[in-house]
Amino acid sequence: MLLVECNVLEKVEVINEGTGTATRLRLRGKFQQCDEQNNNGRIYPRSILESQVKAIQEKIGDRSLVGALDHPANDAIHLSQASHVITGLSIDKDGSVMGECEILSTPNGQIVQALINDGVKIGISSRGVGSVTEGIKGKIVNEDF
């Protein structure tokens, strides 16, 4: 089953780097929360998110973990849809999954930058394939995620 999560980045730190036309827009904020029911009624155990964050560090390091402007219908991102690249991802002691991304100069990245410049609150979403088990507090994402 394709699991899609979307969180509005409530407290986003916007960082403009560089000068003139060479500026880069970076966003930092809370991407997800461990062990709490999210907006879609799912709970991601910390152990699962820790293993996923660890598994994608190489992609983050070589700048190949790109994201799209809109939700793709499946778990694949096509480079023609890219709007940002994830540049950092970690889990705090309180279980907050904190992330950083750089907005790309692609057409979709330019749309994201325009939305941010116009004061629109944007969200961040994650996708993955896995199963869930019905729990007392919500649907718990299983180890096959």
Task: Annotate the PLM regions.
Residues 15-18, 43, 77-79, 112-114, ...:
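Low-complexity, polar-biased intrinsically disordered regions enriched in Pro/Ser/Thr/Gly
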